[in-house]
């Protein structure tokens, strides 16, 4: 159980920051639920909640991220596919990159935006484990690769090793795919195997295992800004989020003085 839910040391250091940056970008109830107003010494719970409800948020974080993203994606990227330009599977992928209706451009625009919020996100490419007799059957059933975006709080552990050619390669990736009450599902990617564990309370059960035919982990870390630590990025709103919180508290003080 401990080995399944164990997290990277760097994850533990950064998880509170990721939550703060996410709430700062989302605003609204997400920000209010973070309780970022400084509490007065003799203030009770009801008074504190009332002050939170009365204090507006001027969301600078969302403005910074969205303006920067709109500037980058003002013109769509140009891609050269060579002989694959007429490939049916490729064109299906370009139109629906994540099997959820988002085109590749829309998916990458969203990935760029979230990497700006968190500092980085993970992109995993997978393909349904459906047996098709022919290529035509695959195309008919839309059995093709697709992308998944994983935000940092759901990538619990990872490991890089330097290959013989000097390049660093990802050798392990632990992803929390879903959580519901005390029930959670973890997928651990390695170069030779892919294992899925269901964790209920304190008990972990191996529910699926398969060979990894690629011999590599089909995942990349998309950085908003690189940090000195591999697998960790630097958020675009690192300073803005704290400035926004200070303004938020100052607005509360002004509102209290007026009242």
Labelled PLM ranges:
Residues 25-26, 32, 80, 99, ...:
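Intrinsically disordered, low-complexity segments enriched in small/polar residues
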Residues 46, 55, 60, 179, ...:
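Intrinsically disordered, low-complexity regions of eukaryotic proteins
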Residues 89-96, 145-163, 216, 221-228:
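Generic detector of solvent-exposed, compositionally biased contiguous segments
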Residues 104, 109-207:
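Extended, Lys/Arg-enriched charged tracts that mediate electrostatic binding to polyanionic substrates
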Residues 1-147:
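Extended, helix-rich architectural segments
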Residues 205-259:
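Extended, charged amphipathic alpha-helical segments
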């Amino acid at each position: 159980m401990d080995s399944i839910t164990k997290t990277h040391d760097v994850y533990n250091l950064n998880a509170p920051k990721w939550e703060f940056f996410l709430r700062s970008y989302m605003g609204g109830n997400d920000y209010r639920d973070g309780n970022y107003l400084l509490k007065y010494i003799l203030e009770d719970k009801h008074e504190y909640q009332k002050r939170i409800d009365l204090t507006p948020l001027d969301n600078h974080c969302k403005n910074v991220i969205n303006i920067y993203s709109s500037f980058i994606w003002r013109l769509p990227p140009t891609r050269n596919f060579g002989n694959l330009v007429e490939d049916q599977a490729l064109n299906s992928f370009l139109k629906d990159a994540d099997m959820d209706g988002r085109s590749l451009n829309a998916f990458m625009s969203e990935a760029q935006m979230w990497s700006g919020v968190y500092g980085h996100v993970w992109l995993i490419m997978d393909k349904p484990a459906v047996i098709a007799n022919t290529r035509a059957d695959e195309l008919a059933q839309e059995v093709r690769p697709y992308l998944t975006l994983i935000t940092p709080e759901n990538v619990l552990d990872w490991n890089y090793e330097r290959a013989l050619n000097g390049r660093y390669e990802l050798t392990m990736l632990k992803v929390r795919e879903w959580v519901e009450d005390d029930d959670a599902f973890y997928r651990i990617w390695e170069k030779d195997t892919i294992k899925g564990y269901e964790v209920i309370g304190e008990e972990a059960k191996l529910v699926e295992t398969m060979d990894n035919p690629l011999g590599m982990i089909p995942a990349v870390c998309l950085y908003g800004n690189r940090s000195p630590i591999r697998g960790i990025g630097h958020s675009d709103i690192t300073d803005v989020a704290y400035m926004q919180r200070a303004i938020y508290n100052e607005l509360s003080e002004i509102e209290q003085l007026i009242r």
